[in-house]
C-alpha cells in the first residue's frame, strides 16, 4: 500500500476512529491484503469491541500470506489464542495457541499464554509446567542478552503463585 493510504490509516488510529479504519480496509481488493493490513484490521475490530470480527479476520487469513506463510500463521494463531483468552474462551484460546506451537513457536510469551489458559481451565499441573518453562526462557534470554526482565518475571511468578494457592 502507498504512503497516502498508511497516513490516512495512522491518522484514524491516532484519533480513535477505528470504524473508519475498518471501512477503508474493507474497500481494498483481496489481493491487496497482507499480514500488516490484517493486523490493523483485527486490532481495529478489537478496539471497537467487535471480537468476533477480529477473530474472523485473523482466521480468514491463515494460509494466505504471500511472503512468509508459516510465520504469518504463527502470528495469526497466537493472536487468535490471545484474543480468545481475553474474552474468556479458554478452550478455543488453547487450541489456537497450540497451533502456533505446532508451527514452531516456543517462546516465553507463548508458554505464558498457554500456562494462563491451562490455569483457567483448571489444568493446574500443566499450567505450572508452562509458566516454569517461561521463567527458564526469560532467564536464558537475560544471560544471553544481558538485560533484566523483572516485570515479566514478576508477572509469571504471580500467575504461579495463584496456581500454587489453588
Language model features: what each stretch is:
Residues 32-33, 66, 71, 105, ...:
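Short coil turns that delineate tetratricopeptide repeat
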Residues 3, 36, 71-75, 109, ...:
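Start-of-helix register in tetratricopeptide repeats
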Residues 14, 47, 83-86, 120, ...:
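Register position in tetratricopeptide repeats
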Amino acid at each position: 500500500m502507498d504512503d497516502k493510504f498508511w497516513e490516512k490509516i495512522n491518522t484514524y488510529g491516532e484519533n480513535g476512529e477505528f470504524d473508519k479504519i475498518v471501512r477503508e480496509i474493507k474497500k481494498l481488493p483481496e489481493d491487496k491484503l497482507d499480514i500488516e493490513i490484517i493486523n490493523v484490521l483485527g486490532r481495529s475490530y478489537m478496539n471497537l469491541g467487535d471480537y468476533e470480527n477480529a477473530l474472523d479476520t485473523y482466521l480468514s487469513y491463515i494460509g494466505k500470506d504471500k511472503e512468509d506463510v508459516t510465520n504469518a500463521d504463527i502470528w495469526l494463531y497466537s493472536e487468535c489464542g490471545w484474543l480468545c483468552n481475553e474474552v474468556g474462551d479458554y478452550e478455543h484460546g488453547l487450541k489456537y495457541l497450540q497451533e502456533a506451537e505446532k508451527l514452531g513457536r516456543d517462546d516465553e510469551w507463548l508458554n505464558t499464554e498457554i500456562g494462563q489458559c491451562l490455569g483457567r481451565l483448571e489444568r493446574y499441573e500443566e499450567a505450572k509446567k508452562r509458566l516454569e518453562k517461561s521463567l527458564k526462557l526469560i532467564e536464558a534470554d537475560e544471560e544471553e542478552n544481558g538485560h533484566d526482565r523483572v516485570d515479566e518475571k514478576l508477572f509469571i511468578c504471580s500467575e504461579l503463585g495463584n496456581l500454587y494457592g489453588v
